From Swiss-Prot:
PANTHER family: FERROCHELATASE, FERROCHELATASE, MITOCHONDRIAL. It comes from Methylobacillus flagellatus (strain ATCC 51484 / DSM 6875 / VKM B-1610 / KT). Belongs to the ferrochelatase family. GO terms for biological process: heme biosynthetic process. Fe cation binds at residues 211, 292. InterPro entries: Ferrochelatase (IPR001015), Ferrochelatase_AS (IPR019772), Ferrochelatase_C (IPR033644), Ferrochelatase_N (IPR033659). Pathway: Porphyrin-containing compound metabolism; protoheme biosynthesis; protoheme from protoporphyrin-IX: step 1/1. It comes from the Bacteria. Catalyzes the ferrous insertion into protoporphyrin IX. It is found in: Cytoplasm. This is Ferrochelatase. The gene is hemH. SUPFAM superfamilies: Chelatase.
Length: 344
């Protein structure tokens, strides 16, 4: 089998296009232990995610985690799975499709948008293949992670590059590293919160929860923590909040090592013990609702807050297919497509 991939057959009249590859984490095929096992194996075998020595991690992964965790995770996925499928997949597909339509209003040159998932299907490799088949000789890689982390943004870019280095006719490549302080992104998050408050009233405190990563990665130079702090402060400023009206926390800790703090779970429980009448939680680092927002934050977080003695607990949905967010995606993409496309 040849190492370099065969180029797709493209009709001579097919125009050259600019491709946008929208990338997100991915999801299992079904909320079952059988479907979770290969998904978790791929996810937890990623060196960007787990940096332990491979022989040690192989025994932990195959001897413990893949024996116990699939069944546990399947139960959690079942609580958020709907008729259309997993929310992350459904929303990501809508985002890619809507972005393609919204770009038509802004650019006149030929282009195409595809969705690729880092783990599971549709894979990043298959999405790149579709863009190549559409005669895309320039491709913008757009990971839907506002804040850069090696375990998310870099992992998605790694996977794209692994496919591209096997490409015989290499396209021009640009990457969106992050957009943590992009005005359109901050505006979209702040507006979604503001609209929620217009319908449901305001809380005593807003908690902005970001996905956690091991503290060690920060010590080694990963900018994720600083970018989360910047995003949170910019959103708070856009909402006109004082420092005592909001807090930033980190969720989804995995394992026993120290992760970025403050941890979400003990923080939300402590707010409950303070007898706050109402707390709202939003997850600015997630472009789409998923297991971590709908189960961990909306369900588990609520239980912790109420058990602590708190009053009302509100989860503010992720940006999903929000019109303001799709327009923000367009602006972020256009900023990185300069010189490649013709604006209307």
């Amino acid at each position: 089998m040849a190492y370099y991939l065969k180029e797709p057959s493209i009709p001579t009249q097919e125009p050259e296009r600019t491709g946008i590859l929208v990338m997100n984490l991915g999801t299992p095929e079904a909320p079952t232990a059988k479907a979770l096992r290969p998904y978790l194996r791929q996810f937890l075998s990623d060196r960007r995610v787990i940096e332990l020595p491979r022989p040690l991690w192989w025994f932990i992964l195959n001897g413990v985690i893949l024996v116990l965790r699939p069944r546990q995770s399947a139960h959690k996925y079942a609580t958020i799975w709907d008729k259309e499928g997993p929310p992350l997949m459904v929303n990501s597909q809508k985002q890619a499709r809507l972005l393609e339509g919204y770009l038509h209003e802004a650019i006149s040159s030929p282009y195409a948008v595809e969705l690729g998932m880092r783990y599971g299907s549709p894979s990043i490799a298959s999405a790149l293949g579709k863009l190549k088949a559409k005669n895309c000789n320039r491709i913008l890689l757009f990971p839907l992670y506002p804040q850069y982390a090696a375990s998310s943004s870099a992992s998605a870019l790694d996977e794209a590059m692994r496919t591209l280095i096997r490409t015989r006719n290499m396209p021009e490549i640009r990457t969106i590293r992050d957009y943590h302080d992009h005005p359109a992104y901050i505006h979209a998050v702040a507006k979604s919160i503001r609209l929620y408050w217009q319908q449901h009233g305001k809380p005593e405190k807003l908690v902005m929860s970001f996905h956690g990563v091991p503290r060690r990665t920060y010590d080694l130079g990963d900018p994720y923590y600083d970018q989360c702090q910047t995003s949170g402060k910019l959103v708070a400023q856009a909402l006109g909040l004082e420092e005592d009206q909001y807090m930033i926390a980190f969720q989804s800790r995995f394992g026993t090592a120290e992760w970025l703090q403050p941890y979400f779970a003990p923080s939300i429980q402590a707010l409950g013990k303070q007898k706050l009448r109402r707390v709202d939680v939003v997850c600015p680092g997630f472009s789409s609702d998923c297991l971590e927002t709908l189960e961990e934050i909306a369900m588990e977080g609520k239980s912790l807050f109420l058990e602590g003695g708190g009053g009302e607990y509100h989860y503010i949905p992720a940006l999903n297919d929000n019109d303001t967010w799709i327009k923000a995606m367009r602006e972020i993409a256009l900023d990185n497509l300069q010189g490649w496309v013709t604006r209307r």
